[in-house]
Amino acid sequence: MDVAVESRVEPVGRIGVSRKVKAYISLTKPRVVELLLVTTVPTMILAARGIPNLWLVLATVVGGYMSAGSAGAFNCYIDRDIDRVMRRTKNRPLVTGELSDREALVFAWALGVASVLVLGFFTNWLAAGLSVAAILIYVVFYTLILKRRTTQNIVWGGVAGCMPVLIGWAVVTNSVGWAPVILFGVIFLWTPPHYWPLSMKYREDYKDAGVPMLAVVRGRAVVGLQVVLYAWAMVACSLLLIPVARMGVLYTAVALVAGGWFLYESHRLYNLAICHATVSPMRVFHGSIAYLTLIFLAVAIDPLLPF
């Protein structure tokens, strides 16, 4: 995999070991990886209807981090040209020169191969196969094909971010059932209300980089409406887990309350957008993270309760 890019990196002095390590970690997009792992472990607890084997959890977390980190590193390598244009990404290591293109590409491949081996040998090969699929979807389907061509880039590219729940379930059961499919659907429907508000804030960045995000092509009113529609579908999908996975009072209460709160925030964003008032898209962006965290905390705790 090689993408020709005109080099415009400012030369930097000799980089110390600690700074180099931090640059490699940054390449894996730790915040994104952290969010993915937040969905994996609760799914494993639900699949086991209790606390799964801790060594299995550790192997899954390590393998999952490597898998998501590999995808993130490939993404940084492929998108290094537009990262140099956007203010939001100007401090990434390939832009600053802390890492060379070759170092990033070798690191991405090494992490990807290591993730497959860790998941395959220490969990099972179904989980490893799903991990490979996640990397391919994010790198090829999203980064190479969709991102620069369509406003629906993050909708279908977001499939990669849904894979950890399938992987977590497969690790415990060596199969895929309806419960993880519903959780997959929740994350799939959550992705647009999460990322599109971000594109509203950084609209000019995406425009300058030539990335056709919905906020760039259609404007904030359309983004607000789409956020509302996806939010309603997401909340409805989250409620399907109650009968399918026999969820209890805690999950039901969290799904209803957190869902109602996020719907309110989504409608608020839309109403401000159509009234041409000042909007705070990052409020919905951060709210979406809080919502997903609460939902998966409930997924983890609910099976452990005696009622």
From Swiss-Prot:
Q: Where are the transmembrane segments?
A: 32-52, 54-74, 105-125, 126-146, 169-189, 222-242, 244-264, 287-307
* Predominant localisation class: membrane
Which reactions does this protein catalyse?
heme b + (2E,6E)-farnesyl diphosphate + H2O = Fe(II)-heme o + diphosphate
* UniProt-listed Enzyme Commission number(s): 2.5.1.141
Q: Say which domain of life the source belongs to.
A: Bacteria
UniProtKB keywords: Cell membrane, Heme biosynthesis, Membrane, Transferase, Transmembrane, Transmembrane helix
**Protein location:** Cell membrane
Q: Which residues form a coiled coil?
A: none
Does Transmembrane count among this protein's keywords? yes
- What is this protein identified as? Protoheme IX farnesyltransferase
Q: Which organism is it from?
A: Leifsonia xyli subsp. xyli (strain CTCB07)
